[in-house]
Regions:
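Acidic, glycine-enriched active-site microenvironments
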Residues: 1-191
Length: 191
């Protein structure tokens, strides 16, 4: 391969056997091994967090694609919606989307969330999420459920996360779920 890259010129490979270059090569090998081990540890942590999330939310399997929705506004005006995507527990920034709110009244977070979800789920060419996460409480959860049902996607798992109280609102449950701040599932949702 290297010979072809060099216009078929002969290539000699040398591996240092002693001295400073040998020490540098050993240091390089050690650093690469440490980076691989660190990356494997991070992957295992994400997998564990996804498994815990599935267990806590009673999902049939760990969610591979989590879509999180948030509504923000500046003093009740200039309302916008945001979509963040996590694939296998990793942020996928190229799939993030920003929605300018067109129809909801300023300050009406429920209507703004409904508009964002309607616009997102009208796009059939986008991949389907394994879990829909909305920022807020019971009201946002109800708004999201209504839109998903109307869009024919009522089968999708949806939860709401009230960040200040660190509580998870689940469909059909009267009381929110409270997890310890160090719980891997909660930490995954809070990203």
């Amino acid at each position: 391969w290297l010979q072809k890259k060099r216009n078929n010129k002969k290539v000699r490979m040398r591996v240092p056997q002693r001295g400073e270059k040998k020490a540098l090569l050993e240091l390089l090998k050690k650093n690469i091994l440490l980076q691989v081990q660190e990356k494997q540890g991070q992957i295992q942590q994400k997998e564990h967090a996804l498994q815990e999330l599935a267990r806590v939310l009673s999902l049939p399997e760990p969610p591979q694609r989590i879509e999180g929705y948030d509504i923000s506004h500046l003093a009740g005006q200039e309302t916008a919606g945001a979509l963040v995507v996590f694939l296998q527990g990793q942020a996928c920034k190229e799939e993030y989307r920003h929605f300018k709110i067109r129809t909801a009244a300023p300050g009406d977070d429920y209507a703004a969330l409904a508009e964002v979800l309607q616009r997102r789920f009208s796009r059939e060419d986008w991949p389907s999420p394994s879990l829909v996460l909305v920022d807020g409480g019971r009201g946002q959860l109800s708004a999201a459920q209504a839109v998903l049902k109307e869009a024919g996607r009522g089968d999708l798992p949806v939860v709401a996360l009230a960040e200040k109280e660190e509580q998870i609102y689940l469909p059909g449950e009267k009381a929110p779920l409270s997890l310890p701040a160090v719980h891997p599932a909660l930490q995954l949702l809070q990203q």
